[in-house]
Amino acid sequence: MSEITYNLKYAMLSLLAVIVAITLTNCTPKTNIPLRIGSNLWTGYETLYLARDLGYYNDQPIRLVDYPSGTEEVRAYRNKEIEGAGLSIDQALVLGATQENIRIIAIMDVSNGGDVILGKPEFADMKALKGKRVGVESSALGAFFIARALEKNDMTAKDIQIVSLELTEHERAYKEGKVDAVVTFGPARSKLLAAGAKLLFDSSQIPGEIVDTLAVSTEAIANSPETIQRVFEKLSEAFKEDMNHADIEKSLRSFR
């Protein structure tokens, strides 16, 4: 995480802290049920797990739940399997269009190169994808990212063949030749780059446009305000730990 990215995240988190504190002051806890928060394998959400492993949540009924991608988190939230979720801002907004009970309480990450489009080694640039098969997750983020990448390269969706893929299918589909390129992130990104895939586009070319958030239900805010406040406050402390200790990144990779 660069110093600029960290400072941006910390500033946004501090601003939201004031808003959340004011909101929660007016809430009276009604229950003490566990707060289930979903997340996926993305660096920005690891701070939740770091805070847990540092013991920051020991006195609170907080349960962290892993999902392969934000798409599964959205599904789980709609099915009432979780009360909170780590979601890209577009996913949170799309979910909010049909689920009026969801609120963003924190900015978790601003993507600066983590979201990528990877292609065959022989592809020189994005324009080499004309007429090619490009794997994309069927999500608002996937659609937004490929659209912006095409726009930045004077291309449109008509120039490529979109192949719908779940995140868990990205690596295999590329290696088996089912697609010529893939829009991906996280472990799949690292593995495909290690296997020789060519980086054609990444989120650093559209700075500030891909933001990851922590969103929770209004019921959770009303029923467990102290728990929500605890999550929020300790995220700030975990961010500081992340910056102050060189071995934190290795620890993050090991506990998931």
Protein language model features and the residues they cover:
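Bacterial N-terminal signal peptides that target proteins for export
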Residues: S2-L13
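Sec-dependent N-terminal signal peptides
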Residues: L13-I19
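C-terminal motif of bacterial Sec signal peptides marking the signal peptidase cleavage site
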Residues: T23-N26
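Pocket-lining segment of extracytoplasmic ligand-binding domains
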Residues: Q91, I162-V163, T168-F255
